[in-house]
Amino acid sequence: MRIDQKAVAARAKALPQHVEHLSVLITELARFAHPADMVVSRYFRSQPKLGNRDRALIAEASFAFLRRKTEISQFAESGQGPLGRRLALLSLFIIMVESGLGSGNRAESALADLAFVVHPGEIEWLQRFGNIERESLAPLTRVNLPEWIWNALGASVPKDECLPLAEAML
């Protein structure tokens, strides 16, 4: 039985080119040289062949990276391969689970949706990320706030109120 790669790619939620584009875009966003929406818009203008579905997936994943930058960046250090790829895979995994862009809002579904783009060893790595209990993370990592905001918050409210307040702001 011969597998039609084009048919498989047509049903895939994420494709290798999504990871490549996202890796480039996240690298640019992480510089914080310009507003994120401007960087994303400029990138899409430079890539006219990207379709609406591609743009939606890449944009959602890039903003997921920015929202959870602390957590994603910290876990990305544990992976192998280019950092941009690791950041892109984690961002895609998050949106497949949390934003309804995947087949189901579960880690198992997200892994299936990413099966077309992951290399050997990356599935287990993404599973470890999906199995992390958020409560086990350090407070700064859990709330994904920049350190200067977390410190300012700690200076202005009682310590026992910092975490609940920061989580409410997300």
Question: Predicted segment positions?
Answer:
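Class I Rossmann-like S-adenosyl-L-methionine
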Residues: 1-170
